[in-house]
């Protein structure tokens, strides 16, 4: 099957592209390779994908409708997976316009191109951050999501609404993927676990917000990719015969929202403690107040995804951290830790 992936040189994009290529699919990647974080890391990811015969690539921004549309219409995919986005909750407070352009305009362009090319299924990456100040734990797809706390979260929720409108008007099958704190090898350097690792190794202080009184649903990259892969052929339909309890399927469109998470809460200090033990160094901790735009807790309910696909996350955070550290030490050529 021909699959078009935006953000192919990103963290999730790399792992997903590899999985699909190994499964025999034909993948066309699309990425701007911007400098929000280390471009060298993005290029290294691209070099891995470049070795696959069934992989092709276009460099471009999703905000550029002309390049994007040309690339999609030429490739003629059956499925589009839209992962490209300007990430980062804190950066969105400083540079909101960047998020409007990349996340909202970029997603609009993707949906327009998907409509023109008549794809069978469009999957759009969203985020657990859209749940915002929601107090219903664990988060279910049918919960209200009207209290976003950051510009990043607001742009993600906006794209969900835009996608639903298009799906309703043109009967375009769309699945929204709400990811929960993704981590693992080849991850993003702006993510907390990545920063913690770098600073612990450098014997520098790590900033811990809200005095560590928060938890996350840390989801290992392989589980995220497994969830997406299982959904490729699970196209939402207005004519679904069997009703599913707490289904987020729209009553007026072939549109569904799905959480992809680990379903286990991990307290921040426990995560840091595991990092310390595996690295063999104690972190120097700098306790800080809660940051603007951040949330104290995230936890997914993935019952709907399990009913539809049989999804069952396999990697606990201890194993996930171990796998991440193994990659980190190899990639950054850290041979020995001196205590």
Locate the predicted segments by residue.
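A glycine/serine/threonine-rich, flexible loop-to-helix segment
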Residues: 137-138, 189-197
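Short, surface-exposed alpha-helical segments at coil->helix boundaries
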Residues: 39, 43-46, 160, 194, ...
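Generic recognition of short, well-ordered alpha-helical segments
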Residues: 15, 40-41, 70, 94, ...
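N-terminal Rossmann-like NAD(P)+-binding domain of SDR-like oxidoreductases, especially those catalyzing
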Residues: 1-182, 315, 319-322, 326-331, ...
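C-terminal substrate-binding subdomain of Rossmann-fold SDR/epimerase-dehydratase oxidoreductases
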Residues: 19, 60, 200-339
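Hydrophobic alpha-helix immediately C-terminal to the catalytic Tyr-X-X-X-Lys motif of short-chain
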Residues: 158, 162, 166, 196, ...
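Heptad-repeat alpha-helical coiled-coil signaling segments
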Residues: 181, 185, 214-216
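Residue-level recognition of oxygen-bearing side chains
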Residues: 67, 98, 105, 144, ...
């Amino acid at each position: 099957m021909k699959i078009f992936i935006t953000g192919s040189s990103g963290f999730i994009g790399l792992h997903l592209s590899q999985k699909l290529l190994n499964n025999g699919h034909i993948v066309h990647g699309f990425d701007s390779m911007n400098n929000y974080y280390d471009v060298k890391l993005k290029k290294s990811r691209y070099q891995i994908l470049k070795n696959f015969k069934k992989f092709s690539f276009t460099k471009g921004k999703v905000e550029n409708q002309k390049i994007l549309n040309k690339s999609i219409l030429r490739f003629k995919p059956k499925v589009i997976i839209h992962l490209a986005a300007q990430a980062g909750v804190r950066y969105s407070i400083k540079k909101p316009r960047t998020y409007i352009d990349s996340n909202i305009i970029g997603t609009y362009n993707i949906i327009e191109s998907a409509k023109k090319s008549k794809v069978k299924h469009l999957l759009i990456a969203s985020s657990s951050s859209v749940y915002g100040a929601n107090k219903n734990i664990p988060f279910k797809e049918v919960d209200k999501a009207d209290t976003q706390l950051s510009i990043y979260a607001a742009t993600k929720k906006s794209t969900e609404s835009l996608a639903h409108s298009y799906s309703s008007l043109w009967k375009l099958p769309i699945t929204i993927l709400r990811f929960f704190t993704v981590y693992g090898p080849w991850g993003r350097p702006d993510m907390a676990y990545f920063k913690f690792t770098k600073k612990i190794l450098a014997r520098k202080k790590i900033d811990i917000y809200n005095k560590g009184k928060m938890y996350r649903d840390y989801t290992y990259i392989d589980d995220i990719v497994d969830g997406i892969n299982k959904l490729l052929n699970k196209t939402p339909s207005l004519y679904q015969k069997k009703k599913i309890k707490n289904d987020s399927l729209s009553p007026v469109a072939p549109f569904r929202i799905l959480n992809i998470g680990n379903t286990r809460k991990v307290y921040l200090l426990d995560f840091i403690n595991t990092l310390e033990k595996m690295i063999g160094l104690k972190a120097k901790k700098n306790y800080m107040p809660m940051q603007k735009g951040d949330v104290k807790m995230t936890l997914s309910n993935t019952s709907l995804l399990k009913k539809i696909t049989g999804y069952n996350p396999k990697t606990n955070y201890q194993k996930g951290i171990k796998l991440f550290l193994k990659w980190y030490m190899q990639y950054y050529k850290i041979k020995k830790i001196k205590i």
